[in-house]
Swiss-Prot record:
The TXY motif contains the threonine and tyrosine residues whose phosphorylation activates the MAP kinases. Residues 96-384 form the Protein kinase domain. The gene is mpk-1. Belongs to the protein kinase superfamily. CMGC Ser/Thr protein kinase family. MAP kinase subfamily. One of its GO terms (biological process) is MAPK cascade. One of its GO terms (cellular component) is nucleus. This is Mitogen-activated protein kinase mpk-1. Keywords: ATP-binding, Cell cycle, Differentiation, Kinase, Magnesium, Meiosis, Metal-binding, Nucleotide-binding, Oogenesis, Phosphoprotein, Serine/threonine-protein kinase, Transferase. A motif (TXY) lies at residues 256-258.
Amino acid sequence: MPTWIPNNLCAQPTTRNAKPPSNGHPQATQQQSAPGSLAYRNSSNIPNGATNHVRQQKWQYTRSGHRKMADGEAVISTVNNVEEVHGQLFEVAPRYVNLSYIGEGAYGMVASALDTITRDRVAIKKISPFEHQTFCQRTLREIKILNRFKHENIINIQEIIRSETVDSLKDIYIVQCLMETDLYKLLKTQKLSNDHVCYFLYQILRGLKYIHSANVLHRDLKPSNLLLNTTCDLKICDFGLARVTDPQTDHTGFLTEYVATRWYRAPEIMLNSKGYTKSIDVWSVGCILAEMLSNRPLFPGKHYLDQLNLILAVVGSPSNADLQCIINDKARSYLISLPHKPKQPWARLYPGADPRALDLLDKMLTFNPHNRIDIEQALAHPYLEQYYDPGDEPVCEEPFTLEMEFDDLPKEKLKELIWEEAEAHHRRMEAEAAARNNGGQNPV
């Protein structure tokens, strides 16, 4: 396994021609002891992460504990336990202070903050979803899923800050562990060694095995949803588009509101094949693996047809058996009308890549979802043999059921459910804290 990432990983290209020592580990001039408890780390040294890139994101503080502003940065002010970040008010004090802007999306902003109890920096996601049903659905879905997930390769929820009553609920704050960067940012600046491609891929699949065992499809796997820290720990995030699926049910026509990033969509999603299965996530992981090998998206389609044509130009025209999986007559007719396209050799697309990585890539990016490799098979692939450990690849003990979906509920009801989930999380955290204080015994 890789025991380090050079200190300049996220600032300058790494040196790739240094020969590894006899134990198969890349030669390192600096190593650090492994924090954490992942059993698949069989060494006291673990990857050292994107150090310089992360250093550029560190914050400077005055002696009083207030953060210094960088040139051109929006001012962050604190009044009455409320901090302003890029025009957004974060009501998270007094526990969380010294906020720093990280990013924002359609209905929320993310900031880092200092937890005054643990003295750790955390990530706080402020979400204001209650004007739109779709945003409420995604918020509730993510909270329900992450409240029940507990896995080292999946982002956790440390705390949910909400109003005292559902009627006064306008915003919700989700506190999570702070991860210094993500795979998208990393690939924008650095070429990964094969060791790190392998290590990251294993962690993705390890987390996805847990997700799929819970009868959940992530549906939006992409580099920006894979968080990384300085020790190269990887965590899957953003479950707003995830869906519960029943392996015993025919999901023909399922996932009608699929809006995930086009570049990582499986072809069956665009072609309306018979049902949607866990294989859609496997396709996305294949696209991510290809991107780690080259720092370029494999299928950067500009629109629906362009996306499909880019896929066919690489994996080749579908066979007659593949076409039978497509129930949309227009889609099938379109594919039949296209000139035959041969499959491209992966070694030509990625010269110098580990042949085992390319073999796994080929099995992930198989056009027919019924012939695509599954997560358990991918974990057992020879490319990942140095990490593969079925005894340390846990599954979810309580899988989700279809009754836990809520597509047709009005936003007012969704708001109530969000508040109830936040309240349930708060009670569970209090019970766990009481149990710890009681010597591990359940509180009376």
